[in-house]
Design a protein with these regions (language model features):
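A short, local hydrophobic-aromatic micro-motif
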Residues: 6-7, 44, 54, 66, ...
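Helical element adjacent to the flavin cofactor pocket in flavoenzyme catalytic cores
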Residues: 9-67, 71, 75
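General beta-strand structural signal in soluble alpha/beta enzymes
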Residues: 37-39, 70, 130, 180-181, ...
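A short, glycine/Asx- and small/polar-enriched loop/turn
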Residues: 1-5, 47-54, 63, 190-194, ...
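C-terminal catalytic lobe of FAD-dependent flavoproteins
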Residues: 116, 155-216
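Short, solvent-exposed secondary-structure boundary motifs
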Residues: 33-36, 108-114, 187-189
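Flavin-dependent oxidoreductases
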Residues: 46-157, 163-176
Length: 216
């Protein structure tokens, strides 16, 4: 549906990557460069001396390092608190649905973003994915993100999301005629101004952050 569209922008050099595959590729590259990756270990403290980071304490002991990078996703705020660093970051509910198979869908189709509908659309394994970003999203676990929450889901609130879903269907009317294969709600972390937090922190030298990237 385009009769209400005033203008559009096509950015030919944009693209998307599978987050899991990209992470595994970065991990392989790091190992090739000599890095050692330790999984299933929790950081219990950030060690510092005279305003500068010296390493971390973990459930397997201490690791000395002149640099520490906080890229803990929605746990980054809690990790920062260990170092005395304040990171304005909050997890909020994010929704998307995947339709049944849709004719004409293929991997080379561009991603469509529609700010007025608070939605984005893209191909997903021969189906259409519709992602919804509410103007004011519902926060999730204000006090603390559970340490053991990983790849989990939140019970979706159909009543609250129905108006946004109906608006999203209007842009691609054919999607409303398809069945829903998956309606997903999960937490993603955002900053108040929707800008990512990247760089060295002012509170602690050599303590870097890369978080809030879902705000992009």
């Amino acid at each position: 549906k385009l009769d209400d569209v005033i203008a559009g922008f096509y950015t030919a050099e944009d693209g998307r990557a599978n987050a899991v595959d990209l992470t595994m590729s970065l991990a392989r590259g790091a190992k090739m460069g000599g890095a050692k990756i330790i999984e299933g270990v929790s950081v219990t403290g950030v060690n510092q001396d005279n305003g500068k980071v010296t390493g971390v304490s973990t459930t397997m002991g201490s690791i000395e390092s002149p640099y520490v990078v906080n890229c803990a996703g929605m746990w980054a705020r809690q990790f920062g608190e260990m170092a005395g660093v304040n990171l304005p970051l909050q997890a909020a509910e994010h929704y998307y649905l995947i339709t049944d198979d849709m004719d004409g869908m293929h991997r080379d189709l561009p991603i469509l973003e529609d700010p007025d509908s608070h939605a984005y659309y893209r191909e997903e394994m021969g189906s259409l994915m519709i992602g919804l970003f509410e103007p004011v999203a519902k926060s999730w676990n204000l006090e603390r993100i559970p340490d053991n929450f990983s790849f989990g889901e939140i019970e979706p609130d159909w009543d609250r999301m129905a108006p946004f879903l109906e608006k999203a269907y209007e842009r691609v009317p054919a999607s409303a005629e398809l069945g829903i294969r998956k309606f997903f709600c999960g937490p993603e972390s955002f900053t108040p101004d929707l800008s990512p937090l990247v760089g060295e922190t002012p509170e602690l030298n050599n303590f870097f952050v890369a978080c809030g990237l879902n705000s992009l």
